[in-house]
């Protein structure tokens, strides 16, 4: 059975292609199932990821107006209770902003559509803040986060396709800022402003990458064997059996990106 043609690209798929074209091929083009655990200890990490997803839902419910006391009753594990308490104590400067939780934006990108689902976008007077909630056990380095495709795509796509969130007016790159907020490190957010030069470089790079993917016939394995320890597809490539330890902050983020949204099944605000 032939896999359906790839129609959308996301921060996760493009990061996969940048990290290991072969993983991109197995995951998105051939759509193979994960044959291996992505990190150890498996059950503990799976529980942590599920709690992270649940925390996102709690925050979304609060942002759409459900009282914090009611939502907080659902924070029924030690991790969830701690993250929820840290969230409520955080001083997010968004009270006077229009809030758009769990919003999906898309725009054409070569033969594909570039799609991103945001945890939260807030807008006021043409100024836009992107919030992304992270529940990692260790805080990734800010300089490691800066070139990641999530950081680049979320800001660029908001500038390209965020008019609907700003009264049908464009949001200039200089008016965009992205914040990674770490639930276990609430006083250590990673903040990334933006400007027109960065936007142009990012969009040009995205167009080039989309064209490269569309024309690709060979998908090479990564030369960085350390990545393979955290890749659930490593069994297809004879790159080891034992999974890496997801307690490493940056490897944990990479493993988290393997649980991507199926953008063929979600609503979006399209440009």
Language model regions located:
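Anion-coordinating catalytic cores for phosphoryl-, nucleotidyl-, and glycosidic chemistry
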Residues: 3, 118, 162, 226-229
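Hydrophobic/aromatic-lined pockets within catalytic cores
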Residues: 30, 63, 67, 135-138, ...
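Mg2+/Mn2+-dependent nuclease catalytic core
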Residues: 103-208
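Active-site-proximal structural scaffolding
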Residues: 7, 146-147, 171, 224, ...
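Tryptophan-centric aromatic hotspots in well-structured domains and transmembrane helices
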Residues: 83-84, 133, 181, 233
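Metal-dependent nuclease catalytic cores that hydrolyze phosphodiester bonds in DNA/RNA
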Residues: 1-121
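Short, solvent-exposed segments of well-ordered alpha helices
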Residues: 42, 46, 141-145, 222
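Accessory terminal regions of nucleic-acid processing enzymes
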Residues: 60, 207-271
């Amino acid at each position: 059975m032939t896999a359906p043609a790839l129609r959308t690209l996301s921060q996760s798929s493009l990061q996969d292609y940048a990290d290991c074209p072969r993983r991109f091929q197995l995951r998105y083009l051939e759509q193979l199932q994960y044959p291996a655990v992505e990190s150890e200890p498996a059950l503990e990490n799976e529980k942590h990821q599920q709690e992270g997803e649940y925390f996102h839902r709690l925050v979304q419910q609060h942002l759409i107006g459900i009282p914090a006391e009611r939502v907080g009753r659902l924070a029924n594990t030690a991790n969830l209770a701690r993250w929820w308490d840290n969230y409520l104590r955080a001083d997010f400067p968004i009270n006077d902003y229009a809030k758009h939780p769990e919003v999906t934006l898309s725009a054409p990108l070569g033969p594909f559509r570039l799609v991103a689902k945001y945890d939260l976008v807030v807008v006021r007077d043409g100024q836009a803040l992107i919030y992304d909630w992270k529940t990692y056990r260790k805080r990734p380095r800010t300089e490691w986060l800066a070139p990641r495709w999530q950081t680049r795509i979320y800001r660029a796509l908001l500038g390209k396709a965020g008019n609907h969130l700003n009264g049908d007016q464009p949001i200039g790159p200089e008016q965009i800022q992205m914040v990674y907020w770490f639930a276990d490190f609430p006083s250590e957010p990673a903040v990334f402003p933006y400007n027109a030069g960065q936007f142009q470089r990012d969009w040009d790079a995205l167009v080039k990458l989309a064209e490269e993917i569309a024309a690709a016939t060979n998908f090479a394995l990564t030369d960085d064997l350390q990545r393979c320890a955290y890749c659930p597809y490593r069994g297809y490539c004879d790159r080891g059996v034992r999974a890496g330890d997801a307690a490493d902050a940056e490897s944990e983020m990479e493993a988290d990106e393997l649980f991507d949204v199926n953008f063929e099944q979600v609503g979006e605000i399209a440009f």
